[in-house]
Amino acid sequence: MSSLTFLGATGTVTGSKYLLEAGGERLMIDCGLFQGLKELRLRNWSPLPIPPPSIQWLALTHAHLDHTGYIPRLVKDGFKGQVYASPATVDLSKLMLPDSGHLQEENAAYANKKGFSKHDPALPLYTYAEAVKSLESFRAIDESKPLELSSHFTLRCFSAGHILGARMIEVTVRENGSVKRILFSGDLGRFPQLILREPVVPEDGFDYLLLESTYGDRLHPRDDVGARLASIVESTAQRGGTVVIPSFAVGRTQELLYLFRELIEQGRMHSLPIHVDSPMAIDVTDLYRRHEEDYDLQTGALEAQGIKPFSPPDVHFDESVEDSKALNAVHYPIIIISASGMATGGRIVHHLQRCLPDHRNTILFVGFQAAGTRGRLIQAGQPVKMYGQYVNIRARIETLDNLSGHADYGEILGWLHKFQKAPGKTFLVHGEPAAAESLRQKVAQELQWDVSVASYLQKVQL
């Protein structure tokens, strides 16, 4: 009998992995890293409950590491199947997975050097070379038509609006005359969109819906995001400080560049030097320029007019380590956009270590900060450790919730209301417990749907 098993993104927003089984074949949807709390990160080191060589296919909703970052380990442990994703997700993964492997090696080397790992020696989950090798399995999906993997599984993809290349995935599962349709929402984007196409409403008639619940317990502010962003930058500049923005290299950095360009062109903000200090974000921005198929009409019109959407005045793309270090010597107001978005690693950690103790500076969070991450600790004003030492927090801490790449519960419910027929069963995933339970109650009360919160390793007979 066909089945669905939840191998991640239950009780947390990380580690997305879902396993479909039918007719002796296995298809995995997403293959992400667990991040944040130590108890979650330790799952990355535990063997999967099924042997990787027994999985024939993997399909990806989008390129974020909490959905793709375990792939090199899966391949290292014996997966020999094919990985299907949108063209933009394939291109983004070519950047992000090798970078993740490099960071894994870097963190292990640093732990060995400083001796703060309990393991001797500390080893990377996978290496740069292993990440590069895993990319050999990737294949791009043609969104315009279904992809029949076998007599048991057929895939279709739809725009999800979360980041460049993000897709919902519909899987048709056939076994012993039974046909089941399952929709994986992936990470659902906002309504309306700043740059990308909005999430579509696929055809109705799903037997199962797996729905994300990141913001299942809150609404994003509806105030003018540009006005607030400009106000934070201007007030910091008046103090002679630096605005440090931990930003996801994919999606959020490009939205910030788009907004800064608009604000400066409209005279709503003075032009300051903007430094994108993330080789990954720089490469991703180039991909955003190339994959116009994901643009909404407004962004496409800008390109047609010769306007570069992601190039505000006085923007600097700091590729080299020397360029990054040079920012330490700057003593006038600037904006630094750097990865990672939750401050778990990357160049942003050095900028935070330097800028957090100075009251003139502002640390601006522009995305979700998962429990247990350095970003969540800073956001809450709690003691935070960097490179083995606690750092004093004297800088102003601001959060811009409007820029989230995830739909809030109002937007999710609005999307669900467009379904002409309720799914047979809805499972909530990709949310911390309070958020998922809150959304469950709202969906049950407002839509009268059969809905529950999925649990880790739960197996459902389809």
Protein language model regions, located:
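Core dinuclear metal-dependent hydrolase active-site scaffold
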Residues: 1-53, 133-197, 322-329, 335, ...
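Pre-active-site segment of Zn-dependent metallo-hydrolases
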Residues: 10-12, 22-81, 85-136, 188-199, ...
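Active-site neighborhood of phospho(di)ester-bond hydrolases with catalytic His/Asp-centered motifs
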Residues: 29-31, 55-64, 71, 83-86, ...
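Short secondary-structure boundary/capping segments
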Residues: 99-103, 109-110, 200, 225-227, ...
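Hard-cation-handling environments
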Residues: 232-372
